[in-house]
Amino acid sequence: WGESASWMLDVNKELAARNFLGEWSEVVVRDRNHPSLVTWTPFNETWGGGPDAYVRLVRDVYNITKAIDPTRPVNDASGDNHVITDIWRVHNYEQDRAKLTEQLKMEEGKEPYRNARDKDFLAVYEGQPYMVDEFGGIPWMAEKDRKNSWGYGGMPENAEAFYKRLEGQIDAFIDSPHVTGFCYT
């Protein structure tokens, strides 16, 4: 995975956006011959983007990436906020298997689960491979470290409870005919 360290990039600032465009182009040129890279992901969790600057930057980055390396798919934004993408990736930290299963259902004519539902300037799902590229987040650490830690769904009481919750999440993905991949974080 060729992914940028772009988390919290303020895409609304012209200088930041133009700097990112130049830096990302250099990354793609540098790494395009690495056989272990299967896709490009220039953005991660670009929650603050507005309809003008964000859409323009994502389209520019997508098109430049494709021009430099037309052999690989481009996932415009990990965690949704898609503008133009070859892979539809979302983040889903739901801890309850039944709720997660319900969220993953794709009904004819309806949008699948997505992180950003309220932004009408974003792309509409068009059947791209659908991945949950961040899930899990189950808190599990030594007793002495728990005070300053966090996670989703509360601390499991023991290792068996941890694995049961994790198994429920994974089973929800495996049982979904639409999920083509997932990544624990």
PLM segments and residue spans:
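Substrate-binding clefts and catalytic carboxylate motifs of secreted carbohydrate-active enzymes
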Residues: 36-40, 63, 101-185
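Intrinsically disordered, low-complexity acidic/polar segments
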Residues: 49, 97, 141-142
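Active-site mouth of glycoside hydrolases
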Residues: 1-87, 91-94, 123-127
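A polyampholytic, Gly/Pro-enriched intrinsically disordered region
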Residues: 93-101
